[in-house]
């Protein structure tokens, strides 16, 4: 794969398009409906302009925006299987593409806050992956922690897809979990503002390298009268190098050819730096099969629900009160 993007379908692998959707300013349900139609128009236009594209990705918050005064209100929440996601499904079916979409999802438990959700829809119009953000961007985001783990699904061109949402990508264990379950193309949809621009680029690359998988990442772009969102869609090779890098332009379409079989081959044939294997097979030259116990205290503590940092008792911010959120839990912000 080169770094010039493409418009045609490669002989092997597939073509992806990541849309640097302009950050939407949303004040009403009608604004959300307009966004849904804008996303659908963009999907069809992208397929027309890039006829070989098989996967089109939209960033976090592209459907409902980031109106923090209203984002928890019932008026602003959507449901997987509701009319908005059904409209996305119909668009994917008409365009014959896979699509990745973001919604803020009503929690089935009315006593708990909503989820920050991503879905993948196939060219038949079927929702084939439903992911709920595991690590909300605390203390800003009020979303309930996801309960579906890190699912993986089949995608185009021999790919195994997983999707993480924004801050999830800063947690290396999530990328490793996706890879451990077979993912070879790790998608990241984000609504980051410029505070973490450098770290965005760094972690997109490191998630690829540590797990011998492609990463495809896309962020909102533009200004919403509070923050600037940096765009900078990025496609990384399984060796951690950047193949395609977007700029800060709203509406920029970042395209690239991806060859999942190459990542699969690296996982099968590499000796040096096959670190996802080495983690569970330490020193396999000296000890046949390697040592399966990595001796990692934090993993054992996580598994036992005993994870605690040495400095945790002295941390200053461990709830959402700095942003005016209640500290009692339960459903708030209706």
Curated annotation (Swiss-Prot):
In this protein, the active site sits at: 60, 133, 166
InterPro entries found in the cross-reference section: Aliph_Amidase/BUP (IPR050345), C-N_Hydrolase (IPR003010), C-N_Hydrolase_sf (IPR036526), Formamidase (IPR022843)
Q: Which biological processes are named by the entry's GO terms? A: putrescine biosynthetic process from arginine
Give me the reactions it catalyses.
Answer: formamide + H2O = formate + NH4(+)
Please give the function described in this protein's UniProt entry.
Is an aliphatic amidase with a restricted substrate specificity, as it only hydrolyzes formamide.
Record's family? Belongs to the carbon-nitrogen hydrolase superfamily. Aliphatic amidase family.
User: What is the top EC class of this enzyme, as a single word?
Assistant: hydrolase
- HAMAP family in UniProt: Formamidase (MF_01243)
One GO term in the molecular function aspect is: N-carbamoylputrescine amidase activity
EC number(s) in its UniProt entry? 3.5.1.49
Give all residue intervals belonging to the CN hydrolase domain.
14-260
Q: What is this protein called?
A: Formamidase
Question: NCBIfam families, alphabetically?
Answer: PRK13287.1
Keywords of the record: Hydrolase
Q: Which Pfam families match?
A: CN_hydrolase (PF00795)
């Amino acid at each position: 794969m080169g770094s010039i993007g493409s418009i045609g379908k490669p002989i092997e692998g597939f073509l992806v398009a990541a849309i640097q959707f302009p950050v939407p300013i949303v004040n009403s349900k009608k604004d959300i409906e307009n966004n849904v139609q804008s996303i659908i128009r963009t999907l069809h236009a992208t397929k027309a302009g890039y006829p070989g594209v098989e996967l089109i990705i939209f960033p976090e918050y592209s459907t409902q925006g980031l109106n923090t005064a209203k984002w928890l209100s019932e008026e602003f929440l959507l449901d997987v299987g509701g009319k908005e996601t059904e409209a996305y499904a119909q668009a994917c079916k008409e365009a014959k593409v896979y699509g990745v979409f973001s919604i803020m999802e009503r929690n089935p438990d009315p006593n708990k806050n909503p989820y920050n959700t991503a879905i993948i829809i196939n060219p038949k119009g079927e929702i084939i992956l439903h992911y709920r953000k595991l690590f909300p961007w605390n203390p800003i985001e009020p979303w309930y922690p996801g309960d579906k783990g890190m699912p993986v699904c089949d995608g185009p061109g021999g790919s195994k897809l997983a999707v993480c949402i924004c801050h999830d990508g800063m947690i290396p264990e999530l990328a490793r979990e996706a890879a451990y379950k077979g993912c070879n193309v790790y998608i990241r949809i984000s609504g980051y503002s410029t505070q973490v621009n450098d770290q965005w680029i760094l972690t997109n690359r490191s998630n690829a390298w540590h797990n011998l998988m492609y990463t495809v990442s896309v962020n909102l772009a533009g200004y919403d009268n509070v923050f600037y969102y940096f765009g900078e869609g990025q496609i990384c090779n399984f060796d951690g190098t950047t193949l395609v890098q977007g700029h800060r332009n709203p509406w920029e379409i970042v395209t690239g050819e991806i060859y999942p079989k190459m990542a699969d081959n690296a996982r099968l044939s590499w000796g040096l730096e096959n670190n996802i294997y080495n983690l569970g097979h330490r020193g396999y030259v000296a000890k046949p099969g390697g040592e399966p116990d990595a001796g990692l205290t934090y993993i054992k503590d996580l598994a036992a629900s005993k994870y605690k940092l040495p400095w945790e008792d002295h941390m200053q911010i461990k709830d959402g009160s700095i942003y005016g959120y209640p500290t009692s839990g339960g459903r708030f912000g209706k």
